[in-house]
Regions:
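Active-site-adjacent loops and short helices of periplasmic peptidoglycan-processing enzymes
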Residues: 1-155
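Domain-terminus/edge residues, biased toward the C-terminal soluble/receptor-binding domains
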Residues: 121, 132-280
Length: 280
């Protein structure tokens, strides 16, 4: 792969890395940011899952991967989300971008504003779907940051990334299988997204939850960019995840929500101050 990164998503610690700040084309990994903004709009109740959105001529004519919707349809937001995530549908992605942003151009502005707010210094978006375009780029580090934010901020929507097959009613029975092969070979994997263009190569952001000794449900995240084939990106991602769970040991220093020290305070409002990690 041109670049890769393995991160302990629970702690935000990088475990393995290669060229993680080199600019790369994200291909359909762009849809991770599109999904983030769609989920944010859902959480803010700007849209709802059962709300229907129109399919514009622009969305209908999108090249590349599609869920095969057309302008005669009014498609529920939830089905567009499934089409974007499972089928990597560029038409579904455009319909969502237009529905949330009012236009694709305004939605791209929102994408770049969110990237800046997240500190994604090596990322710039030119479109919501990830087709090759000058100036459209990211880095492995930024993709890891974005993915961990997606997992942390919207856990209620993670289940969409585990769907293995999906086809919208009335559309052709093709391109309906999730392109993340790790979902079919590793039961601990629950996401996230594949990407491919001739310029970007084969890319995959994968995440899994497994138990470390005395620390259940530890989440690791792998980013593999610019692999030579579908098989290579899957195998490299699987190797990274397996290595992370076997080469590292998580050590719990103390429980969250419990004080580990209570130093005295001189002339303070309280006689002592409890110190420790606030979160349980």
């Amino acid at each position: 792969a041109k670049a890769y990164l393995l991160m302990d998503a629970s702690a935000g610690q990088v475990l393995a890395a290669k060229d993680i700040d080199a600019p790369v084309e994200p291909a359909s990994l762009t849809k991770l940011m599109t999904a983030y903004l769609v989920f944010d709009a859902l959480k803010a109740r700007k849209i709802s899952l059962n709300q229907t959105l129109p399919v514009s001529e622009r969305a209908w004519k999108m090249p590349g991967s599609r869920m095969f919707i057309d302008p005669k349809m009014q498609v529920p937001v939830e089905d567009l989300i499934k089409g974007m995530i499972v089928q990597s549908g560029n038409d579904a992605t455009m319909a969502l971008a237009e529905g949330v942003g009012g236009s694709a151009e305004r939605f791209v502005q929102l994408m770049n504003e969110q990237a800046k707010a997240m500190g994604l210094a090596g990322t710039q978006y030119r479109n919501p779907e990830g087709l090759t375009e000058p100036g459209h780029h990211t880095t492995a580090r930024d993709l890891a940051t974005l993915s961990t934010r997606l997992l942390r901020d919207f856990p209620e929507y993670l289940h969409y990334y585990t769907i293995r097959k999906y086809r919208y009613t009335g559309t052709p029975a093709c391109n309906d299988t999730n392109r993340n092969p790790l979902l079919f070979r590793d039961p601990t994997v629950d996401g996230l997204k594949t990407g491919h263009t001739s310029a970007a190569g084969y890319c995959l952001v994968a995440t899994a939850r497994r138990d470390f000794p005395n620390l259940p449900g530890r989440r690791l995240l792998s980013v593999v960019l610019g692999a030579s084939s579908e098989t290579a990106r899957a195998n490299e991602s699987q190797k990274l995840l397996n290595w992370g769970y076997t080469a590292y040991e998580a050590v719990k220093l103390f429980d969250g929500g419990q004080p580990v020290a209570s130093p005295k305070v001189w002339k303070g409002k309280s006689a002592e101050l409890k110190l420790g990690r606030g979160e349980p």
